[in-house]
């Protein structure tokens, strides 16, 4: 890491956090990781070897801290999260600036992400979420009650993504800590400095509360460290956000651990359908926002736009003009930039190769995605019209390339929406509730929106997908479900029970 970046954002040099102490990464035995400014790739933000050996120590520290942490009262754990909330609010600009520098998206979005960290605490402590892990008692019969109480899973591995390097892992560890789990966090190797800043703030919150050392740990690294972490026998659960290919490998590696929860929030090939009675201006704005927000680097971005033939000649040119006029530039620009650079040079190359592949398969370029003639991983929006979508050719492109297909009716729109292995988000634009209700009933997706884009989500609601998009709802309001498990107890309250028929028990056997 450059000295400038270190001085501006981090307290410690590049390090892992193990049992409350930051261990310098210098001289480590793991793969070297590096992050650069995507708008100015010659500027290195973070560069260091990693330490695979720290993974076992971090898991052991989390295991050691678990009894004391889970044994604390709910109020004590809430107090730590409230302090975390205060620290993230006080450091929101610092967090946002570092995300811009390391990930590249526009600063307004980065600041929104930084402010959402504290909001997740409020949501998790709200009745819609907290009620899902609140103990309760029910009468079972005349003499017995049934208790339901919740226990933490134990040591949870949280593996974060690069596109929302603060918000998404925070969405896992806030409910996990609340319910008494301990954490080993591995940030994306594309945003390690952001991960370390969050770890520094979390450790400060824990230290100020007198929490046990090892409640929250962090290990930096790439695939080698992630594989070591997810294979560690001391892990009780894995909360992962990332691609289908990596999520599949994690799931396969845990087939012999049926008791270990593996919650995967993966990618999407998300459709948006525009019907003839839609408000077309609204549909254009929402589809463009959802397709190109974060330079196409959201799992909920609209990848496939399905347009009814009756309005195709109006919608498609308007959408293409909107895409062509989106302002692309550095995330910290004072201009009203909509899209920043892609996170890596490889990401930029893959987006352009994806566009070429669509053309090679018969697609027609309506808006040509190109690299900007300037330093940085900048790619302009692309729009490609295809004849139809098929499961066989369905691929998630994590970049600013939108595909458009024309359909003749709602039946075909539903069929085309379902022509995917994914099932994360979908949108329908129509004035009729009945049209949306049918679309909702027949489309396979975890999030189905009406007259708003696929990229809109709220932590107050469940979030997750089907198929290649994931296996649980580890984000949003239902995230607590995957951080604690219910335990049932039958409680006799009526004293000595009468023996059942066929069993003889004499009172005299128990005389002193």
Task: List PLM regions with ranges.
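Rossmann-like NAD(P) dinucleotide-binding subdomain of oxidoreductase/dehydrogenase enzymes
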Residues: 135-282, 336, 407
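Conserved C-terminal structural/oligomerization subdomain of aldehyde/semialdehyde dehydrogenase
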Residues: 39-46, 210, 235, 273, ...
């Amino acid at each position: 890491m450059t000295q400038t970046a270190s001085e501006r954002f981090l307290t410690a040099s590049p390090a892992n956090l193990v049992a409350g102490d930051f261990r310098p990464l210098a001289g480590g035995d793991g793969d070297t990781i590096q992050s650069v400014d995507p708008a100015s790739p010659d500027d290195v933000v973070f560069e260091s070897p990693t330490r695979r050996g720290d993974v076992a120590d971090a898991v052991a520290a989390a295991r050691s801290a678990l009894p004391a942490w889970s044994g604390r009262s709910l109020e004590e754990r809430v107090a730590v999260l409230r302090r975390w909330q205060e620290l993230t609010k006080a450091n929101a600009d610092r967090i946002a600036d570092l995300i811009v520098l390391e990930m590249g998206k526009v600063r307004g979005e980065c600041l929104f992400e930084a402010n959402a960290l504290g909001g997740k605490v409020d949501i998790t402590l709200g009745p819609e979420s907290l009620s899902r892990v609140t103990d309760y008692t029910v009468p079972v019969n005349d003499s017995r009650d049934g208790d339901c109480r919740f226990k933490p899973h134990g040591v949870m591995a949280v593996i974060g993504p690069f596109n929302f390097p603060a918000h998404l892992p925070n969405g896992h560890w806030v409910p996990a800590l609340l319910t008494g789990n301990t954490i080993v966090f591995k940030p994306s190797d594309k945003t390690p400095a952001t991960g370390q800043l969050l770890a520094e703030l979390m450790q400060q919150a824990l230290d100020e509360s007198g929490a046990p050392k090892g409640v929250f740990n962090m290990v930096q690294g790439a695939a080698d460290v992630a594989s070591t972490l997810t294979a560690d026998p001391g892990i009780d659960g894995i909360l992962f956000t990332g691609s289908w290919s990596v999520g599949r490998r994690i799931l396969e590696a845990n087939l012999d651990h049926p008791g270990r929860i593996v919650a995967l929030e993966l990618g999407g090939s998300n459709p948006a359908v525009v019907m003839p009675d839609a408000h077309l201006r609204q549909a254009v704005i929402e589809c463009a926002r959802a397709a190109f927000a974060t330079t196409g680097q959201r799992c909920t971005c609209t990848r496939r736009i399905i347009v009814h033939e009756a309005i195709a000649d109006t919608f498609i040119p308007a959408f293409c003009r909107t895409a062509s006029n989106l302002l692309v530039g550095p995330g910290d620009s004072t201009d009203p930039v909509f899209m920043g650079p892609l996170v890596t040079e490889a990401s930029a190359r893959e987006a352009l190769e994806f566009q070429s592949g669509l053309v090679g398969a018969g697609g027609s370029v309506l808006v040509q995605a190109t690299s900007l003639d300037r330093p940085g991983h900048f790619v302009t929006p692309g729009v490609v019209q295809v004849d139809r979508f098929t499961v066989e050719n369905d691929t998630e492109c994590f970049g600013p390339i939108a595909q458009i297909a024309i359909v003749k009716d709602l039946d075909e729109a539903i069929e085309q929406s379902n022509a995917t292995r994914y099932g994360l988000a979908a949108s329908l634009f129509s004035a009729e509730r009945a049209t949306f209700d049918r679309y909702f009933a027949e489309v396979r997706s975890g999030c189905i929106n009406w007259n708003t884009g696929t990229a809109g989500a709220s932590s107050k609601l469940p979030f997750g997908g089907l198929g290649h998009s994931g296996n649980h709802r580890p984000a949003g309001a239902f995230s607590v479900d995957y951080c604690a498990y219910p335990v049932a107890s039958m409680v006799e309250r009526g004293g000595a029970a009468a023996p059942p028929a066929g069993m003889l028990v004499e009172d005299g056997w128990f005389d002193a």
